[in-house]
């Protein structure tokens, strides 16, 4: 439900809110809906300050993949993440990753069903592509076949995260509690490609100052507020916050394109 999957540590709160607002605008214009589940599969850690922002933006659930199980061995894949001022979201961490290998979904799903056989409801993420979600014909055929084969013992449906969380809440009312940032993850990203980080912070501050000055100019002198120009700058800022751009985990070409 966001504009993109950003780094969730370095951007300030205003930037996170801008990201959410752009995502809201897209989903409302294209689909006429406003999601209540936020998804940041691949972000390298998550600041606890996000919880309050998520709540105030209308999200009550969150799907992540990092930090991985080896780094944060939580009791369960679903847990209650508590933030500031009494805020909280129900989080699902997918330990099976967020995408699948072309032509392997049938076998992967069978293993997933075996691993989660004691759960009343579970969430399996599949699809090709950098962040999954791209169903191939061969995998869809295999999944359809498996749905028919296992119909007598369990129900497999194509669905969405909101539906999963609704079923999960109906089946389970208490969860392990986490009251801290989901960090550290990939610590090298905190210092890698520092030029991107410096330019990002500069642009963040310049946009905030520019908005204030433009508002004052309109109120005091009738100068037209440069809405489109500022929006273009905001989109550039959000692009730079992508979780492989701002952290510096991309190639040199990515760094140059971001700059």
Residues covered by each model-derived region:
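Catalytic-domain carbohydrate-binding cleft regions of carbohydrate-active enzymes
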Residues: 1-259
């Amino acid at each position: 439900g966001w504009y993109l999957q950003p780094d969730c540590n370095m951007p300030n709160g205003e930037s996170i809110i801008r990201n959410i607002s752009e995502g809201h605008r897209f989903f409302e214009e294209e689909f006429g809906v406003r999601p209540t589940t936020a998804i940041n599969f691949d972000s390298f850690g998550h600041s606890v300050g996000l919880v309050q922002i998520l709540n105030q933006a209308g999200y009550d659930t969150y799907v992540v993949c990092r930090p991985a199980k080896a780094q944060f061995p939580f009791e369960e894949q679903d847990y209650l993440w508590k933030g500031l001022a009494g805020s909280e979201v129900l989080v699902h961490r997918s330990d099976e990753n967020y995408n699948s290998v072309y032509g392997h979904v049938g076998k992967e799903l069978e293993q997933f069903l075996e691993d989660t056989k004691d759960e009343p409801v579970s969430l399996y993420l599949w699809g090709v592509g950098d962040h999954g979600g791209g169903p191939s014909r061969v995998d869809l055929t295999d999944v359809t076949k498996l749905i028919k084969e296992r119909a007598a013992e369990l129900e497999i449906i194509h669905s969405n995260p909101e539906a999963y969380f609704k079923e999960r809440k109906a089946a389970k009312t208490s969860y392990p509690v986490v009251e801290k940032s989901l960090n550290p993850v990939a610590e090298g990203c905190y210092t890698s490609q520092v030029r991107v980080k410096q330019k990002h912070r500069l642009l963040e501050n310049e946009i905030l100052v520019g908005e204030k000055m433009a508002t004052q100019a309109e109120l005091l002198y009738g100068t037209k507020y440069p809405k489109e120009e500022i929006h273009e700058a905001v989109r550039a800022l959000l692009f730079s916050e992508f979780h492989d751009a701002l952290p510096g985990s991309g190639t040199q070409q990515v760094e140059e394109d971001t700059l």
